[in-house]
């Protein structure tokens, strides 16, 4: 009789992880993916509603939604595994950043000389005198 009770306990300990795994695969795992796809659909619909208001200047001709790639919610890992590190990208792509003209960089370069010292009292163009504020600075 003791041997029979031992078999049931052993069977129960073997069946519990199997039931837990089945429950996880059938109930827990599909729910985040379904809700994520519903949210992506809502975001795409919202972006399509905004596109006619913005006009054709957006240039989104390839049909891909940028909301899916930009939202951090869709970059999370599902389950209890390790999270994939999220690589932060700049808002402006590198190619467009090189094409943009930044006035701030030019004014900062005028305020400092080649050695990183500030130029005080510059009153003319850059070729007037190349010193730190007056003509008789050094020699």
UniProtKB/Swiss-Prot annotation:
The keyword Signal applies. InterPro entries: Gastrin/cholecystokinin_CS, Sulfakinin. Belongs to the gastrin/cholecystokinin family. It is found in: Secreted. Residues 1-35 form the signal peptide. GO terms for biological process: neuropeptide signaling pathway; smooth muscle contraction. Coiled coil: none annotated. Residues 36-71, 81-109 form a propeptide. This is Drosulfakinins. It comes from the Eukaryota. It comes from Drosophila pseudoobscura pseudoobscura.
